[in-house]
């Protein structure tokens, strides 16, 4: 059994929606990123890679590589799952915490869980996503961006 932790942050910029957990959410800003900016899937990918001692998404999908410009983070996550499986691991469960003042995440959580479960090849009850605010403190509280913490449990195949 292995446990990994992932963390990612993206700042708000131009746009009228964000993508989190593979779900498009209307918002007054977009997220600035080299890929599609799905901070939730980036943190989950890092947690999975960390648990398998395979580095991080920057190593596998560098933002200096034009192939990943605007990349679909769901495709990147599925690739991470394949890399982890090649090393003899399968996902036991994942848990993520979205830290954001806005937009409200509650209406989208179940859809995120389903999308993530599909990409991980696991049941929805092996995926947990929750959200919190920082009571208007820090960069997330000032609505400058979004952060996500994620943990993943891997089990031998």
Swiss-Prot record:
<feature type="binding site">
    <location>
        <position position="42"/>
    </location>
    <ligand>
        <name>a divalent metal cation</name>
    </ligand>
</feature>
<feature type="binding site">
    <location>
        <begin position="8"/>
        <end position="10"/>
    </location>
    <ligand>
        <name>4-CDP-2-C-methyl-D-erythritol 2-phosphate</name>
    </ligand>
</feature>
<feature type="binding site">
    <location>
        <position position="8"/>
    </location>
    <ligand>
        <name>a divalent metal cation</name>
    </ligand>
</feature>
<feature type="binding site">
    <location>
        <position position="142"/>
    </location>
    <ligand>
        <name>4-CDP-2-C-methyl-D-erythritol 2-phosphate</name>
    </ligand>
</feature>
<keyword id="KW-0479">Metal-binding</keyword>
<feature type="binding site">
    <location>
        <begin position="61"/>
        <end position="65"/>
    </location>
    <ligand>
        <name>4-CDP-2-C-methyl-D-erythritol 2-phosphate</name>
    </ligand>
</feature>
<comment type="pathway">
    <text>Isoprenoid biosynthesis; isopentenyl diphosphate biosynthesis via DXP pathway; isopentenyl diphosphate from 1-deoxy-D-xylulose 5-phosphate: step 4/6.</text>
</comment>
<feature type="site" description="Transition state stabilizer">
    <location>
        <position position="133"/>
    </location>
</feature>
<dbReference type="Pfam" id="PF02542">
    <property type="entry name" value="YgbB"/>
</dbReference>
<feature type="binding site">
    <location>
        <begin position="34"/>
        <end position="35"/>
    </location>
    <ligand>
        <name>4-CDP-2-C-methyl-D-erythritol 2-phosphate</name>
    </ligand>
</feature>
<feature type="site" description="Transition state stabilizer">
    <location>
        <position position="34"/>
    </location>
</feature>
<feature type="binding site">
    <location>
        <begin position="56"/>
        <end position="58"/>
    </location>
    <ligand>
        <name>4-CDP-2-C-methyl-D-erythritol 2-phosphate</name>
    </ligand>
</feature>
<dbReference type="GO" id="GO:0046872">
    <property type="term" value="F:metal ion binding"/>
</dbReference>
<comment type="similarity">
    <text>Belongs to the IspF family.</text>
</comment>
<feature type="binding site">
    <location>
        <begin position="132"/>
        <end position="135"/>
    </location>
    <ligand>
        <name>4-CDP-2-C-methyl-D-erythritol 2-phosphate</name>
    </ligand>
</feature>
<keyword id="KW-0456">Lyase</keyword>
<keyword id="KW-0414">Isoprene biosynthesis</keyword>
<comment type="function">
    <text>Involved in the biosynthesis of isopentenyl diphosphate (IPP) and dimethylallyl diphosphate (DMAPP), two major building blocks of isoprenoid compounds. Catalyzes the conversion of 4-diphosphocytidyl-2-C-methyl-D-erythritol 2-phosphate (CDP-ME2P) to 2-C-methyl-D-erythritol 2,4-cyclodiphosphate (ME-CPP) with a corresponding release of cytidine 5-monophosphate (CMP).</text>
</comment>
<feature type="binding site">
    <location>
        <begin position="100"/>
        <end position="106"/>
    </location>
    <ligand>
        <name>4-CDP-2-C-methyl-D-erythritol 2-phosphate</name>
    </ligand>
</feature>
<dbReference type="InterPro" id="IPR020555">
    <property type="entry name" value="MECDP_synthase_CS"/>
</dbReference>
<feature type="binding site">
    <location>
        <position position="139"/>
    </location>
    <ligand>
        <name>4-CDP-2-C-methyl-D-erythritol 2-phosphate</name>
    </ligand>
</feature>
<dbReference type="GO" id="GO:0008685">
    <property type="term" value="F:2-C-methyl-D-erythritol 2,4-cyclodiphosphate synthase activity"/>
</dbReference>
<dbReference type="GO" id="GO:0016114">
    <property type="term" value="P:terpenoid biosynthetic process"/>
</dbReference>
<dbReference type="GO" id="GO:0019288">
    <property type="term" value="P:isopentenyl diphosphate biosynthetic process, methylerythritol 4-phosphate pathway"/>
</dbReference>
<dbReference type="InterPro" id="IPR036571">
    <property type="entry name" value="MECDP_synthase_sf"/>
</dbReference>
<dbReference type="InterPro" id="IPR003526">
    <property type="entry name" value="MECDP_synthase"/>
</dbReference>
<comment type="subunit">
    <text>Homotrimer.</text>
</comment>
<protein>
    <recommendedName>
        <fullName>2-C-methyl-D-erythritol 2,4-cyclodiphosphate synthase</fullName>
        <ecNumber>4.6.1.12</ecNumber>
    </recommendedName>
</protein>
<feature type="binding site">
    <location>
        <position position="10"/>
    </location>
    <ligand>
        <name>a divalent metal cation</name>
    </ligand>
</feature>
